[in-house]
Regions:
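Bacterial N-terminal signal peptides that target proteins for export
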Residues: 1-11
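Bacterial N-terminal signal peptides
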Residues: 11-20
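Boundary at the C-terminal end of the N-terminal hydrophobic targeting segment
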Residues: 23-25
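Acidic/histidine-rich, surface-exposed loop or edge segments in extracytoplasmic proteins
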Residues: 29-67, 151
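Auxiliary, metal-adjacent structural segments of Zn-dependent hydrolase domains
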Residues: 65-127, 137
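Short pre-active-site segment immediately N-terminal to the catalytic Zn-binding motif
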Residues: 126-144, 156-160
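Active-site recognition of the HExxH zinc-binding catalytic motif
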Residues: 141-154, 166, 170
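Post-HExxH zinc-binding segment in Zn-dependent metallohydrolases
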Residues: 159-178
C-alpha cells in the first residue's frame, strides 16, 4: 500500500512536471475526459488522425463548432462504444488524455513513469488514470484499445491480471468498427 502511494505520488509529480515543462498546456473537457495538449497544431493533428471510420456520419456539422468540439465528440463516442463492446459501464467515469507531439515524447513519458524503454505510440497509465497518445500514430483501434484499459480499470474494484486486460483490450480494438 505504501509503495503504491509513493508510486502514484511520483507519477503525478512526473506528469505535472511533464505537462508544465512543455510550456502552456491547454485543455478541453469532454463528458468523460480532460484532454491536455501543448499546441493547437497538436490538437488539429490529433483530430485529423482520429478517424472514426464508419461512425464518421455521426459528425453532424451543425452540432460541431470547431476542432475542440469534434475531439470531444469523438472521444465520448469511442468511450461509449468501448463500454458497450465490453459490457462494462463504470459509474463516474473520468480520465485524462495527454496528446504528445511525437512518439519520442510518448517514449520519454513512459520511461519517466515506468523506468523502462518502449516503442509504444500510445499507452494507458492506470496509476495516474491517463491515456497518452502520439499525434503521429493514431488509429481507431489504438484508441479503443487504450480506452478499454481505462474502462476496465474503472470498472473492476480489483483489476484483472495483465493478460486478461490485454485480451479484452484487443477484443475492444478488434470490434470497434462492428
Amino acid at each position: 500500500m505504501h509503495d503504491q502511494l509513493i508510486k502514484t505520488t511520483a507519477c503525478t509529480l512526473i506528469l505535472l512536471l511533464f505537462t508544465c515543462g512543455l510550456c502552456m498546456a491547454l485543455e478541453i473537457k469532454s463528458r468523460y475526459a480532460t484532454i491536455i495538449y501543448n499546441e493547437e497544431k497538436d490538437l488539429h493533428r490529433f483530430n485529423e488522425e482520429f478517424y472514426l471510420g464508419k461512425y464518421s456520419y455521426l459528425l453532424r456539422k451543425d452540432d460541431i463548432a470547431g476542432v475542440s468540439d469534434e475531439v470531444r465528440f469523438k472521444t465520448d463516442l469511442i468511450v461509449e462504444r468501448v463500454k458497450s463492446i465490453l459490457d462494462m459501464f463504470p459509474e463516474n467515469l473520468e480520465f485524462r488524455i495527454e496528446i504528445c507531439s511525437s512518439e519520442r515524447e510518448i517514449q520519454k513519458v513512459y520511461k519517466l513513469i515506468y523506468r523502462k524503454t518502449t516503442n509504444y505510440s500510445a499507452f494507458y497509465a492506470p496509476e495516474i488514470n491517463t491515456v497518452f497518445f502520439s499525434v503521429n500514430d493514431m488509429e481507431l483501434a489504438t484508441v479503443a484499445h487504450e480506452f478499454a484499459h481505462m474502462v476496465m480499470t474503472s470498472y473492476f474494484n480489483v483489476s484483472p491480471p495483465v493478460k486478461i486486460h490485454e485480451l479484452l483490450s484487443r477484443y475492444a480494438a478488434r470490434h470497434i468498427t462492428d
